[in-house]
């Protein structure tokens, strides 16, 4: 138990659910997690197929701020991930091949719980990238086309954050991808060793 633990997220990005086993499984996982710790909300599937949850969480890595805003909420419609439930072989948590055509009405967001964008951004930046002679795209990874200058990075980040903040009447919160670089993923706001990667006062101002 620790105060920094805000919620439990048993599953991530389940986009290939079958219509028979997964709904029952996800419902059971929600119940079990809540019984193990009734003091914290359960985000049953982060960024994937939602059955029962205390937090409706979506992932969207659109890099253009205006398009990001439009995708998350437009004309009264919230963003929902596209589920692939008609594959011959579903690819979720270790289930055997099942009939993917069973009738199941997947829930749509109805406002009864918080709606969070708990993955977005992921903008790639390699420290001292502007000083490098080679294109680091081949050596590391991030979402979208990497910015070519630090100023371009700050502009894109601020645009994305402002796009979500402008939806404060619909979106309850956000989580940026990600806090630190991880192995080949060079999209953190800190380096892998937790050293500063940017002007952190400027980063703080953007996220504030």
Each language-model region and where it sits:
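Short, hinge-like loop/turn segments at secondary-structure boundaries
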Residues: 58-63, 74-75, 192-193
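Short, structured secondary-structure boundary patches
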Residues: 1, 63-67, 197
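Active-site neighborhood of glycoside hydrolase catalytic domains
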Residues: 1-56, 62, 112
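Short aromatic-enriched loop/helix-cap "lid" or pocket-rim segments at secondary-structure transitions
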Residues: 20-22, 54-56, 68-71, 128-130, ...
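Flexible loop/turn segments at secondary-structure boundaries
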Residues: 14-18, 50-52, 64-65, 123-127, ...
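Substrate-binding clefts and catalytic carboxylate motifs of secreted carbohydrate-active enzymes
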Residues: 6-8, 31, 76-208
């Amino acid at each position: 138990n620790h105060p920094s633990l805000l919620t439990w997220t048993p599953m991530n990005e389940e986009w290939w659910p079958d219509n028979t086993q997964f709904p029952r499984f996800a419902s059971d996982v929600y119940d079990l997690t809540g019984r193990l710790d009734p003091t914290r909300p359960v985000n049953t599937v982060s960024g994937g197929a939602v059955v029962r949850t205390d937090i409706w969480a979506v992932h969207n890595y659109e890099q253009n701020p205006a398009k990001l805003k439009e995708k998350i909420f437009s004309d009264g419609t919230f963003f929902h991930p596209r589920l692939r439930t008609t594959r011959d072989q579903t690819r979720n948590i270790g289930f055997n091949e099942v009939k993917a055509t069973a009738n199941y009405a997947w829930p749509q967001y109805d406002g009864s719980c918080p709606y969070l964008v708990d993955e977005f951004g992921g903008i790639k930046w390699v420290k001292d990238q502007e000083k490098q002679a080679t294109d680091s795209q081949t050596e590391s990874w991030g979402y979208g086309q990497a910015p070519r200058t630090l100023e371009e990075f700050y502009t894109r980040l601020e645009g994305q954050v402002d796009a979500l903040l402008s939806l404060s009447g619909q979106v309850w919160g956000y989580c940026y991808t990600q806090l630190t670089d991880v192995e080949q993923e060079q999209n953190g706001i800190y380096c892998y060793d937790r050293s500063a990667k940017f002007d952190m006062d400027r980063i703080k101002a953007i996220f504030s």
